[in-house]
A protein has these predicted regions:
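Short glycine- and basic-residue-enriched patches
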Residues: 1-95
Length: 95
């Protein structure tokens, strides 16, 4: 259940838990600049996988913040929970 959606113009007014603040800020910048991001993502079923994603939107739902993104590994749109992103790197590639 989505409780909020990222709006680039209101980024400064968003409160984010300290544990995911860096991840949130990198994703917000990537969304604004249409840049790809490299993440290590933890899945309960598959453990950690490394993925390149094209992030489109940040959203708040019942269990926390998420990002809607195109996953280059799965070739599909996916939702990723920010609390499950272990490592993140902003790339110099655009989408």
């Amino acid at each position: 259940k989505v409780r909020g959606i990222y709006l680039g113009s209101k980024l400064e007014n968003v409160e984010v838990m300290d544990s995911i603040k860096d991840t949130y800020n990198i994703l917000a910048k990537a969304i604004k600049e249409h840049r790809k991001v490299l993440i290590d993502y933890y899945s309960y079923k598959k453990g950690i996988t490394t993925r390149t994603i094209n992030p489109y939107d940040l959203f708040l739902y019942s269990s926390g913040w998420g990002v809607a993104a195109y996953c280059n590994l799965r070739h599909d749109l996916r939702h990723f929970e920010l609390k499950r992103i272990d490592k993140i790197k902003l790339l110099d590639e655009f989408f």
